[in-house]
Every structure is written in structure tokens, then in C-alpha cells.
């Protein structure tokens, strides 16, 4: 059986690992290194260079060297070279092809199956793009796995009942995840992150600082010189790495550029303290995702058994100190190599999928809630955020109008209670509903998220069996900044949303009661005394009038009045029945009806018993 590899496709570096005798091994590349730079270059003769060789020639071939392509995954970014257009999937595929070749050379056999990792906060389009890159590279992508989850899998395989915090700061992305490990099960409890925060940003701050210092000293703007900028980037990365182990470094770049007076040289000292001041706000951006994860998981800091640092950027002393401070003084686990742990976890997951690793179950999560818009503009969640995937959830909804021929299913992603404030992923219509009173049709809406985090939605009329489906793909997933904005807004406007939801529910209850009471009066016209009928009709008329306005308190009061006077209908019916010596007749709204009305909320989701509750239109 062909072996499957685990690939950590990183922003700055990539790693490939394989199981040998059940133990994960990091594969050494053709250059003798265990990590491969995620750099692609096109030589002047048209040859495609990947990895260390591409990185080495970058200064003299700036325009034809592409790095950090992971930051463009899932976007419409393109680069034109030699009359050809390349997208991020193709660029990533060049890197994956090299990793595939190195693995084949090491193993002495063909490699086709792979598990590829992505940041936990990658959205649908970014995951799709990663999968496509693997396919372009000739790989059969068995699974897309979240990086922190893979790290925990690598770390926690032989551990019992522990809670692990994974702090993953790579070259271009940042994730925090909280996982529980026990009895061979690795379960993600919560995850959060920032897809545009990583070591590249720290490098850029040093580049900006050097450009400013050089402009002040020589009056020349190096940011306009592509070749000089490339040298600055490499020097900044080197300085950052040196400052992790020493308190001061010198950046010396002779012949960086030239002026009318002749060649100019850059010679700058940079202390660790200066570096930390330049990047203090980047460090601050790591705090919010951390706090969100602790809050979402609903645990105390004292309950965290181990802290695992992942990604080369966690080697920066300021980052390690921040993690220690955030976790209440806990020392991070030093038993894992932050550069390799994700690939090791990916190879273990590949082993699980191929049946080589037994008794391990990996339970990943979806980072945002998913639902549909229901009557009153409410967001009715079918799948809550941090739900384990793969998952399938279905609920029964109904129509809001008599003889409604179709229902619109509008799919949203986010945490706000009002649908319009969330991210709309798409919509479709279920048509051809047979004529029926409102509340009668039963429409089953099903959400299905597969193990790769890709979503499918279906709506089915249980009466006719008609079904409509939709797959959420491409650019429909959420960008990182939208996710963060939604989370912050959800907390900020929680009270306002709650009030709006209550108002919508009050209106729905009022409309439902008007409909039921009028129908009852019509069906039992000859059995209701005139005075009772007049009193009920007056109360219903008042409620209808209030429903034209926006005052939810008045609507609630009028609804309660109708519920109270409608009890007289039941009393009158039973009195008539007893007078005639007959058994009680038709059901009256009465207490039972009023109570039912309290339960009937058009936007509410329903249990597996298939009770009809919400209006889906």
C-alpha cells in the first residue's frame, strides 16, 4: 500500500513528514534541510526554482521571485510571467511538487496521498484553494487539517486526559486553539485567530525602520528600489532571528544603493528593546484571539495542563513572554520543535486515514455559527460555532403565509442575532409547495459540513419530497477581518440584538394569535354567543392595529388581552355543549392556545421530533 505523507504548507517554510514503522519522521529535502522555504522563482531561462535555491537568487531576480503566496490563497491574486498567468494555487502547487519529489526520493516509491494543513481560521475559499493546489501538484488530498489540531495530535498521542493550549504564530498566520486529549481522542474545544498576522509582519517593521533611518541619513528612499528592498527583507529576517538569542545585532548592507556622490552603504545597530518597541502593536494583536478562545471554551486558566508553541515566530522572546503572561505564568512545553510539529501531526492523521494508526480520533471544529434567516429577520442558528466537524444538523421550518408557493432559504455565517448583520453566504429557493394554510407545510433544512470544513445546504418539502441543494464554495466564505468584526460587534451589540429579537418574537406571537383566533371564530360562528364574539373581535382588532406599529410593549399587552378574552370562547363552547348534553366539541384556543402561542416563535429551531415551529420565509 502506498504511503501517505503529512504536509505543513507554510507561509515562509514548508515541511513534509511520513510514518515509518508507525513513528513520524521529518523528511530531509534534496538540499539536506528539514524545512523548505516556501519560495518560487522563475529563472531567466524559464526554469522554475523552488525552496532554498529560489530564496538564494531572490536579490538578483526580484520581479520573478514569489514568496508568502499563502497570504493570497482564496483570492483572485495573479502574477504574469513570460506571457503566462499564475494564481496562488499554481504557485503553492510548485512548492507541493518539490515536497512530493523530496518525499519520493527519500522513500524510494511514488507518493500520491497527502494530508495538508491550514490555519484553523482559514475560510472556505482558502481551504478550497489549498485542496486545489494539492490536486494541481498531483496529490490526492485525503484531508485538510487545522494546524493547531495537527500540533496537538503530534504532541498528545501518548497523553492522558489533558487540556492543551496551542499558540501557533507562523510566518503569515496566527491561531490559538484549546484542545482536550484523552483515550486517543483529540477534541478541539475552541479556536480563534488572525489570518494576516505572522513573522512577515515583524520583518516588515524592521524594513520600514531601516528605510526611515536611511532616508534620514542619506536622503534616499530605499522603498522605491526593488533590489534594495529585497536585501532589506532578508537582512530584517536575519536580524529578527539573531535578536531571539542576543540583545543587539548589526545590520550591515554594503552598496545598498548609489547616489550622485557614489555608492551608499547601510550600517545600523538594532537592539532587542528597539525591535520590541517597533513591533509592540503586533504583539498586542495576539491577545484578543487568546482571550476569545478561553471565553468560548468556558475554562479557567488553571485548567490548562500544557501550552504548546507552534511556528518559528514563537521563538521570539517577547512572544514567549506574552504567552507566559497570558497563561498565568505557565512555561510552554519545550518537547516539540515548533517548525516540525504540524507536519508530524499531519503525517499521524494521514496514518489514521490509511489505517496505519489505530485508536486515534481527531475531532476538529467549525469556527463560526451557521444558520438561516427566519421571520422577523432573525438569524436562526443550525450549527453553533466550535461545533465538531464533520457534522450534519437539520431542523423543520414552516411557511409564514397561507398558500405560500415557495420559501427562500438565505444562509448566513456569524454570531449576531439579526441575520442582516451577519455574513450572507448565499441563498436558494424551494419552489412548488402545494397550497396550504400557513404553518402546515413541513420544510426540512439541513446543513452538512464535511471533514474539510466545506458546507452543503439542502431544503426539502416533507409533503412532496421536493428538494433543493446548494454548496458554499469559492469566494463565499468569510475573510478574516469580517470574522473579527462580527465577533466584536456581536458582543458590543448583544443587548440591542436581544431587544430586536424579542420585538420580532412578540410580533410573531401576536400575528399567530390573530390568525388562530379569527380562524376559530370563523369555524365556530354559530356556536359562539354574540356578546363574546364582539368582545373577542374588538380585542383582535386592537391587536391588529398595534401590529401596524413598532411598539413591542404595546403589541405584547394587546396579545395578552386577546389570549385572555379568547378563554371566554372556550367557556362559552363548553357551556353550550353541556346545555345540549353533548360531549365537548371543537377545540377552543383558551389556555391551551395561549400557552401554545407562547411556544410558537416563528424563528425558533425545532427538535428531532419534527415539531413545526419557525417560518422560513
From Swiss-Prot:
Residues 579-593 have a biased composition (Low complexity). Induction: By stress conditions e.g. heat shock. Residues 489-505 have a biased composition (Basic and acidic residues). SUPFAM superfamilies: Actin-like ATPase domain, Heat shock protein 70kD (HSP70), C-terminal subdomain, Heat shock protein 70kD (HSP70), peptide-binding domain. InterPro entries: ATPase_NBD, Chaperone_DnaK, Heat_shock_70_CS, HSP70_C_sf, HSP70_peptide-bd_sf, Hsp_70_fam. The modification Phosphothreonine is found at residue 173. Gene3D superfamilies: 1.20.1270.10, 3.30.420.40, Actin, Chain A, domain 4 (3.90.640.10), Substrate Binding Domain Of DNAk, Chain A, domain 1 (2.60.34.10). It comes from the Bacteria. One of its GO terms (molecular function) is unfolded protein binding. Residues 599-609 have a biased composition (Acidic residues). Keywords: ATP-binding, Chaperone, Nucleotide-binding, Phosphoprotein, Stress response. Residues 489-512, 579-617 are annotated as: Disordered. NCBIfam families: PRK00290.1, prok_dnaK. Acts as a chaperone. PANTHER family: HEAT SHOCK PROTEIN 70KDA (PTHR19375). HAMAP family: DnaK. Belongs to the heat shock protein 70 family. This is Chaperone protein DnaK. It comes from Streptomyces griseus subsp. griseus (strain JCM 4626 / CBS 651.72 / NBRC 13350 / KCC S-0626 / ISP 5235).
Amino acid at each position: 500500500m502506498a504511503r501517505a505523507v503529512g504536509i505543513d504548507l507554510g507561509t515562509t517554510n514548508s515541511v513534509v513528514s511520513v510514518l515509518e514503522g508507525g513513528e513520524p519522521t521529518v523528511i530531509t529535502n534534496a538540499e539536506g534541510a528539514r524545512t523548505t522555504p516556501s519560495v518560487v522563482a522563475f529563472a531567466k531561462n524559464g526554469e522554475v526554482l523552488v525552496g532554498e535555491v529560489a530564496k538564494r537568487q531572490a536579490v538578483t531576480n526580484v520581479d520573478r521571485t514569489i514568496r508568502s503566496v499563502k497570504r493570497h490563497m482564496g483570492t483572485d491574486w495573479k502574477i504574469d510571467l513570460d506571457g503566462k498567468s499564475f494564481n496562488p494555487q499554481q504557485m503553492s502547487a510548485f512548492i507541493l511538487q518539490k515536497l512530493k519529489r523530496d518525499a519520493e526520493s527519500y522513500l524510494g516509491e511514488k507518493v500520491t496521498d497527502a494530508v495538508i494543513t491550514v490555519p484553523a481560521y482559514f475560510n472556505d475559499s482558502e481551504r478550497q484553494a489549498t485542496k486545489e493546489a494539492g490536486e494541481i501538484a498531483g496529490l490526492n488530498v485525503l484531508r485538510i487539517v487545522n494546524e493547531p489540531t495537527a500540533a496537538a495530535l503530534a504532541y498528545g498521542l501518548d497523553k492522558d486526559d489533558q487540556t492543551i493550549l496551542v499558540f501557533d504564530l507562523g510566518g503569515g498566520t496566527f491561531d490559538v486553539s484549546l484542545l482536550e486529549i484523552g483515550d486517543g481522542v483529540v477534541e478541539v474545544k475552541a479556536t480563534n485567530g488572525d489570518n494576516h498576522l505572522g513573522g512577515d509582519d515583524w520583518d516588515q517593521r524592521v524594513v520600514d525602520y531601516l528605510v526611515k533611518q536611511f532616508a534620514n541619513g542619506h536622503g534616499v528612499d530605499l522603498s522605491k528600489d526593488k533590489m534594495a528592498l529585497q536585501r532589506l527583507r532578508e537582512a530584517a529576517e536575519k536580524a529578527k532571528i539573531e535578536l531571539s538569542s542576543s540583545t543587539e545585532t548589526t545590520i550591515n548592507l554594503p552598496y545598498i544603493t548609489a547616489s550622485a556622490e557614489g555608492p551608499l552603504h547601510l550600517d545600523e545597530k538594532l537592539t532587542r528593546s528597539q525591535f520590541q518597541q517597533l513591533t509592540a502593536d503586533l504583539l498586542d494583536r495576539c491577545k484578543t484571539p487568546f482571550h476569545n478562545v478561553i471565553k468560548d471554551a468556558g475554562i479557567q486558566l488553571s485548567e490548562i495542563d500544557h501550552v504548546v508553541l507552534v511556528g518559528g515566530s514563537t521563538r521570539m522572546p517577547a512572544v514567549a513572554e506574552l504567552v507566559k503572561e497570558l497563561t498565568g505564568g505557565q512555561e510552554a512545553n519545550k518537547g516539540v520543535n515548533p517548525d516540525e510539529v504540524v507536519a508530524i501531526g499531519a503525517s499521524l492523521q494521514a496514518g489514521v486515514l490509511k489505517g496505519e494508526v489505530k485508536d486515534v480520533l481527531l475531532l476538529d471544529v467549525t469556527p463560526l455559527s451557521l444558520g438561516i434567516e427566519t421571520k422577523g429577520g432573525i438569524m436562526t442558528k443550525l450549527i453553533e460555532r466550535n461545533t465538531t466537524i464533520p457534522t450534519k444538523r437539520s431542523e423543520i421550518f414552516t411557511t409564514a403565509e397561507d398558500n405560500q408557493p415557495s420559501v427562500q432559504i438565505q444562509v448566513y455565517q456569524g454570531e449576531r442575532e439579526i441575520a442582516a448583520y451577519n455574513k450572507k453566504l448565499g441563498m436558494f429557493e424551494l419552489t412548488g409547495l402545494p397550497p396550504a394554510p400557513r404553518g402546515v407545510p413541513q420544510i426540512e433544512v439541513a446543513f452538512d459540513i464535511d471533514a474539510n470544513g466545506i458546507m452543503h445546504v439542502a431544503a426539502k418539502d416533507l409533503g412532496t419530497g421536493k428538494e433543493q441543494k446548494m454548496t458554499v464554495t469559492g469566494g463565499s466564505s468569510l475573510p478574516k477581518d469580517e470574522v473579527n468584526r462580527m465577533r466584536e460587534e456581536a458582543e458590543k451589540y448583544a443587548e440591542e440584538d436581544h431587544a430586536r429579537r424579542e420585538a420580532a418574537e412578540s410580533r410573531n406571537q401576536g400575528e399567530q394569535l390573530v390568525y388562530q383566533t379569527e380562524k376559530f371564530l370563523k369555524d365556530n360562528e354559530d356556536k359562539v354567543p354574540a356578546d363574546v364574539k364582539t368582545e373577542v373581535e374588538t380585542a383582535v382588532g386592537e391587536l391588529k392595529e398595534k401590529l401596524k406599529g413598532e411598539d413591542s410593549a404595546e403589541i405584547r399587552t394587546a396579545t395578552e388581552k386577546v389570549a385572555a378574552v379568547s378563554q371566554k370562547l372556550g367557556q362559552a363552547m363548553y357551556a353550550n355543549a353541556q346545555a345540549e348534553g353533548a360531549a365537548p366539541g371543537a377545540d377552543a384556543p383558551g389556555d391551551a392556545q395561549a400557552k401554545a402561542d407562547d411556544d410558537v416563535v416563528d424563528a425558533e429551531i425545532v427538535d428531532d421530533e419534527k415539531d413545526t415551529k419557525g417560518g422560513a420565509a
